[in-house]
């Protein structure tokens, strides 16, 4: 079930301007709380040099995967199950961490 967030559409361009600069030399980014999946897909389209690792609670995975499937981007990865207060963080090394609207 693909979810939609108007907040993602409203803030994606200002956020993109910042992360384009801050993640210019990065390759692997962990998004904490990917929510609907809109930001992941939008940033993946505009920043193809990044491997964007989505993550969220299992209840949001279907929406994240629906946005990923529609976009067909190989650099936006399937969501990890991540509950920041109770689960272990991924062992993979990331060059940056992103979170918005969570």
Predicted ranges, named:
Residues 10, 38, 59:
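Short alpha-helical
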Residues 30, 41-87:
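Class I SAM-dependent methyltransferase SAM/SAH-binding core
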Residues 1-26:
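Class I SAM-dependent methyltransferase Rossmann-like catalytic core
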Residues 26-35:
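Conserved class I S-adenosyl-L-methionine
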Residues 99-102:
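A short beta-strand submotif of the Rossmann-like class I SAM-dependent methyltransferase core
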Residues 89-97:
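A short acidic, Gly/Pro-enriched loop at the edge of an enzyme's catalytic core
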Residues 24, 74, 92:
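Structured loop/turn residues at beta-strand edges in well-structured enzyme cores
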């Amino acid at each position: 079930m693909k979810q939609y967030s108007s907040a993602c559409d409203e803030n994606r361009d200002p956020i993109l301007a910042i992360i384009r600069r801050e993640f210019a030399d990065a390759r692997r980014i962990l998004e904490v709380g990917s929510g609907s999946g809109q930001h992941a897909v939008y940033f993946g389209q505009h920043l193809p040099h990044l491997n964007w690792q989505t993550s969220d609670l299992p209840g949001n995975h279907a929406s994240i995967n629906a946005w990923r499937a529609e976009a067909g981007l190989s650099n936006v990865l399937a969501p990890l199950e991540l509950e920041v207060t109770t689960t272990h963080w991924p062992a993979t090394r990331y060059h940056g961490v992103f979170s918005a609207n969570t």
